[in-house]
């Protein structure tokens, strides 16, 4: 992985490829390159490093030609260097490939091709795809057939685009377990791993499904089944968000912009789901075996969902990381199971695999997804959209709070069916965007706290009940973008081990809203303070000011709503700490926005 762009049309391809790659930078990468076909010759320029550096050094944008492909790479096979950067070619230099994913039978196929005389230049699994097509072309003279036969040999995951020097009018594309999208322009076509790469030119898109390949020319495309070769009918999706929504809009970083977009995003999540929530509640109200799955931040949303569903519907809920679910629950799920799969991108490999497993076992699958048209939305039985809009920063912010909002709305609707009183929360929902806006008003105070804890190497986040996931998410944000060790845990666990790590000056961030466990939280805070902990408390009770070094005062709210509001100051804290440490919060090291390999 990580980013793919392809273009065919009347314009010079290279500037469009460079622009597309820059719009995919948020996905994370260690190297980049482009290949452009012009007058029967493919020119490749690539290297390790950032796109701006490579453009300056290698002059990507100067390559002539109207058809080309580009890639940003995140190393999986082979170290990040100039040779391993994509694109890759066969022995003849006529077949050029960019690829996201992992070829699991790489070593077996490479050994076979080496015996047949192929010479490999890199350590990547991608290069063998070009050689495999080349080998097939020796026997099968039709390039499409040679391409499809190569796909049938590959095991693992891939999204790939192939450029063939002898066919200057077409791009060849394929997908299995890694996203790939066709952008339909006016006399031009785009191919990309994510929508922002081509959104400046068109908002019309076709999403490839697993097991499909395609042939793309200037004026048309055809998508076929890899196994049968039969054509498939594909729907054209109109992307509802704009390129401006995917720009910084005057903020220093996408992450800060997206934190500040949360009042709007929450409003859209509420009012964009009024009818959908009722319809979904009708479908899922009779399930009493519920499993929620997700990865990373989406897993934390699932943990909050568990508390919400259990409180409102009185139904026990299992929450599992999607990467574990697919291996441990195969014999547990059946037609009486509701699986709630939460994924921002709709392409998270482990979550998509979990959905497929659940479907194969006859379970009903509800997807909670941000990206319209993504794979999860196409394979789930029903989908609720979070309506967060594009999120470019790698660390999830507004997509998390909108996931929580959707889960809250659904749990309330289901609760009403059994007579649960949700009127207090219903009454406060119209004010929720305003409440989040007031939390954003604490930005300068939180920036000051970030300066105070800047020298610290360990942070501890504690919460109870529905805010244990808030502690986990707050700690994750610190790890993701500030690169500081942080641990989130139930406050009740402190005395069972972690308290041994609390010493003079160690920051302890306490999520402590009023509620049934507040008195217990006060006791836990006192325990940490007695060991010298530097106490930062979030809550509404004045007593927190007396036992805390820093008190982030938030309004008194129904406990079920607090995870949506209380995470906002923690997002700001992580952001400011990252910036103070000299990090780019939009592009944290070693991380990708959408994890499309397992």
Curated annotation (Swiss-Prot):
Function: Catalyzes the first step in hexosamine metabolism, converting fructose-6P into glucosamine-6P using glutamine as a nitrogen source.
EC number: 2.6.1.16
Species for this entry: Pyrococcus furiosus (strain ATCC 43587 / DSM 3638 / JCM 8422 / Vc1)
Reactions mediated catalytically: D-fructose 6-phosphate + L-glutamine = D-glucosamine 6-phosphate + L-glutamate
Localisation: Cytoplasm
Domain named Glutamine amidotransferase type-2: residues: 2-219
Domain SIS: 280-420, 449-588
InterPro entries: GATase_2_dom, GFAT, GFAT_N, GlmS/AgaS_SIS, GlmS/FrlB_SIS, Ntn_hydrolases_N, SIS_dom, SIS_dom_sf
Top enzyme category: transferase
PROSITE patterns the UniProt entry points to: GATASE_TYPE_2, SIS
Name this polypeptide is given: Glutamine--fructose-6-phosphate aminotransferase [isomerizing]
Active site, UniProt feature: 2 (nucleophile), 593 (for fru-6p isomerization activity)
Assembly and binders: Homodimer.
GO cellular component: a single term: cytoplasm
């Amino acid at each position: 992985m990580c980013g793919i762009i392809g273009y065919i049309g009347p314009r010079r391809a290279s500037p469009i490829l460079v622009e597309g790659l820059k719009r995919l930078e948020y996905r994370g990468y260690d190297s980049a390159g482009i290949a452009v076909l012009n007058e029967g010759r493919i020119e490749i320029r690539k290297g390790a490093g950032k796109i701006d550096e490579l453009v300056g050094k290698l002059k990507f944008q100067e390559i002539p030609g109207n058809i080309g492909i580009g890639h940003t790479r995140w190393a999986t096979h082979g170290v990040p260097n100039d040779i391993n950067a994509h694109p890759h070619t066969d022995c003849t230099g006529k077949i050029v490939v960019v690829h996201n994913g992992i070829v699991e039978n790489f070593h077996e196929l490479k050994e076979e091709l080496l015996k047949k005389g192929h010479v490999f230049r890199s350590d990547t699994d991608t290069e063998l795809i070009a050689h495999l097509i080349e080998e097939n072309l020796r026997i099968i003279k039709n390039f499409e057939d040679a391409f499809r036969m190569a796909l049938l040999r590959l095991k693992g995951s891939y999204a790939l685009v192939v450029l063939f020097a002898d066919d200057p009018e077409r791009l060849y594309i394929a997908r299995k377990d890694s996203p790939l999208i066709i952008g339909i322009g006016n006399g031009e076509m785009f191919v990309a791993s994510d929508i922002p790469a081509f959104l400046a030119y068109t908002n019309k898109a076709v999403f490839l499904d697993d097991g499909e390949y395609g042939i793309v020319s200037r004026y048309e495309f055809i998508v076929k089944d890899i196994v049968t070769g039969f054509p498939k009918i594909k729907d054209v999706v109109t992307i509802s968000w704009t390129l401006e929504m995917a720009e910084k809009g005057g903020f220093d970083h996408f992450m800060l912009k997206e934190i500040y977009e949360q009042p709007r995003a929450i409003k859209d999540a509420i009012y964009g789901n009024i009818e959908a929530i009722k319809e979904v509640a009708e479908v899922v109200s009779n399930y009493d075996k519920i499993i929620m799955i997700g990865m990373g931040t989406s897993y934390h949303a699932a943990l909050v969902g568990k508390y919400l569903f259990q409180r409102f519907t009185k139904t026990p809920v299992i929450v599992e990381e999607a990467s574990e679910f697919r291996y441990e629950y195969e014999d547990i799920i059946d037609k009486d199971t509701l699986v709630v799969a939460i994924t921002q991108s709709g392409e998270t490999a482990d979550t998509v695999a979990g959905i497929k497993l659940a479907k194969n076992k006859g379970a009903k699958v509800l997807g909670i997804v941000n990206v319209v048209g993504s794979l999860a939305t196409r394979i789930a039985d029903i989908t609720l959209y979070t309506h967060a809009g594009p999120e470019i920063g790698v660390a999830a912010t507004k997509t998390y709070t909108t996931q929580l909002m959707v889960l809250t709305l659904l749990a309330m609707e289901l609760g009403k069916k059994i007579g649960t009183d949700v009127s207090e929360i219903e009454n406060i929902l119209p004010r929720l965007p305003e409440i989040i806006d007031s939390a954003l008003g604490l930005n300068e105070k939180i920036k000051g706290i970030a300066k105070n804890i800047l020298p610290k190497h360990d942070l501890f986040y504690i919460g109870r009940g529905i805010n244990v996931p808030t502690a986990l998410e707050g700690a994750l944000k610190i790890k993701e973008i500030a690169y500081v060790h942080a641990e989130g845990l139930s406050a009740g666990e402190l005395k069972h081990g972690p308290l041994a790590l609390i010493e003079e000056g160690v920051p302890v961030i306490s999520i402590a809203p009023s509620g049934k466990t507040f008195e217990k939280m006060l006791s836990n805070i006192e325990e940490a303070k007695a060991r010298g902990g530097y106490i930062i408390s979030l809550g509404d009770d004045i007593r927190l000011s007396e036992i805390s070094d820093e008190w982030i005062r938030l309004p008194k709210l129904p406990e079920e709503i607090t995870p949506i509001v209380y995470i906002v100051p923690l997002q700001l804290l992580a952001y400011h700490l990252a910036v103070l440490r000299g990090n780019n919060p939009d592009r944290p090291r070693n991380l990708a926005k959408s994890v499309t390999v397992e």
